[in-house]
Amino acid sequence: MVGRRLDTLVRELSLAWCRSKGEPSCAVREDLLAEQAKAAEVIERSDGVILLKAPTGFGKTEIWTAPFFAQWLRGEWFAPRMYVVEPMHALLRQMKRRMEVYAQAVQGLGLPRLNVAEDHGEVAKPLFLYGGHIVLTTVDSLAYGYLARRVQRWREEGVERGRYSMPAGLLASAYIVLDEAHLIQDEAYLGPRVLGKIVCDLASAGAKVVISTATVPETFLKHIPCLGGRLTLGSGTVRRNVKVERRKGVLKAEEIECGKPTIVIVNTIERARRIYKQVRCGKKAVVHSLMRREDKERQLSKVLADGKVAEDAVLIGTQALEVGLDFSNLRALYTETAPVDALIQRIGRVGRDGDKAEAYIYEAEGDAPYPQTLMRATREALEKELLGGAALTSWEDAQRAVDKVYNEKAVEELMTRGLAWYGQALGYLQELSLFSYPPRGEVRIRPSNYITLVIADVKQDGDKGRYITEDDVERGAMKMSYTSRDDPRINALLQKVSTAYTVRGVATAKDETRYYLSELRRSWDGVEVVVVDRRDVEELYDEAGLDVAQLSGGGQKRKGRGRRRR
């Protein structure tokens, strides 16, 4: 009975998502349906932490979503809410749309309308992991919520108060899915280690956790000692119809052929901006992390038609394009060499409909932003086992390549870079307890931190001062990473603008939420949000986003404007 209900759910979810994309015909692969339903049943009956590994396009999302919806059909409950945890912001928007499509589809099976919410660093109003049956969030937001660092706080009689234990309590009774888990990594392998501790703590408290992935390395899983069952699906999957060719030298704009749906993925924002400005194709767009949200959408609209990339269009970008895109008709990929797991993601962008596609791998201008250890190991693998990249079209060969590159020696070399941060995290976790103030001191789940930069039209509200609206935040926010408060890019930005602001208060006026601002006069230490007037960055920001070359010493401070900030 349970199996039949899960079978029905997986079918309805698959068809609903297909129809939402405007596909001319939608059908369920009957040869996979029974395997998907069986995997969903294993997850439903399991406790603790379970691994779900399957190739891209196998239907992992339907597998781990079905058990949550099945609770309403059975009238038996294991979790009141589901957290879908993504490693990158680029994945959130499409996954939210997907969950909304699913929630609407299951109403036809007799389920109530389930709420889908977002809670992460780019939302205007943080929910602190509360606010929906299904909550879309990031690894950072989940981890810092559990660690009592991202919580609701206020001052009462001169004393700070906060709901420090609320996120941990919500998570301990929840169904948590770590989606695209193979992307949870960094140059010091700090994230996998700290997250492994958090996941096991939550599982021991009663949470059900699914680790969903295509090619997670075994060295990652070793940091989750509480891992229980493993579900590996899709063995013997047919090799994808993508011709991979490794080319000598670095990618030049004139080598990009126009006339078919094409994607170009390079390793740095500066390279993406340069190629975008040089490529001569008629329809072109660029997308990277240092762009306002509305500008990303405007760029994409230039090359999309009916939910697909136009036949004569080129889409250019950075790692932001590796995930979160579901354009089935891309026919050509031009990419720089990157760690093997990134190459797998990039090659996975083309030929998704089964038709023939091509992928060209060029040498990178340098190793940055990736660790030299991984770049060296990937180049060696491309020369030998991967046959110049051709083997990356096979899921099983790709998994073996990931394990070879992320071997114990390589990962140990990465981990030595983050020993101090990991030691701080362990000490913090030992002191952390319910119903008390969080421990003092810093804790990180990755070497880099982020500030939210909002580029918007700053307005004046009489004597109340300058402000921006909630809509301005939604349209104009982006994330800037830093490893220390001496970050040269952020300091250069603050020196080049006449005035920078931070948020001092929030109020509702004229049916809109307003964020009132105060000038950022000196240090940005402790500041999480920086606001800059759009008119003040006209020389630094254009249709291709923030000009990072100027923030790396390529530009001069504007005459007669700005103050030097330390």
UniProtKB/Swiss-Prot annotation:
A motif (DEAH box) lies at residues 179-182. One of its GO terms (cellular component) is cytosol. InterPro entries: Cas3-like_dom (IPR054712), DEAD/DEAH_box_helicase_dom (IPR011545), DEAD_box_RNA_helicase (IPR050079), Helicase_ATP-bd (IPR014001), Helicase_C-like (IPR001650), Helicase_Cas3_CRISPR-ass_core (IPR006474), P-loop_NTPase (IPR027417). Keywords: Antiviral defense, ATP-binding, Helicase, Hydrolase, Nucleotide-binding. It holds the Pfam family Cas3-like_C_2. Its EC number is 3.6.4.-. The keyword Ligase does not apply. One of its GO terms (molecular function) is RNA helicase activity. SMART domains: DEXDc, HELICc. ATP binds at A54, P55, T56, G57, F58, G59, K60, T61. Residues 41-234 form the Helicase ATP-binding domain. Residues 250-400 form the Helicase C-terminal domain. One of its GO terms (biological process) is defense response to virus. Induction: Repressed by 5 J/m2 ultraviolet light and 50 mM NaCl, slightly induced by 20 J/m2 ultraviolet light, 100 and 150 mM Nacl. Member of the csa5-cas7-cas5a-cas3-cas3'-cas8a2 operon. Proteins of this family have an N-terminal nuclease domain and a C-terminal helicase/ATPase domain. In some CRISPR/Cas systems the domains are swapped, in others they are encoded separately. Can form a Cascade complex with Csa5, Cas7, Cas5a, Cas3' and Cas8a2. Belongs to the CRISPR-associated helicase Cas3 family. CRISPR (clustered regularly interspaced short palindromic repeat), is an adaptive immune system that provides protection against mobile genetic elements (viruses, transposable elements and conjugative plasmids). CRISPR clusters contain sequences complementary to antecedent mobile elements and target invading nucleic acids. CRISPR clusters are transcribed and processed into CRISPR RNA (crRNA). Cas3 plus Cascade participate in CRISPR interference, the third stage of CRISPR immunity. Probably unwinds dsDNA templates, thus providing substrates for CRISPR-associated endonuclease Cas3-HD. This is CRISPR-associated helicase Cas3. It comes from Thermoproteus tenax (strain ATCC 35583 / DSM 2078 / JCM 9277 / NBRC 100435 / Kra 1).
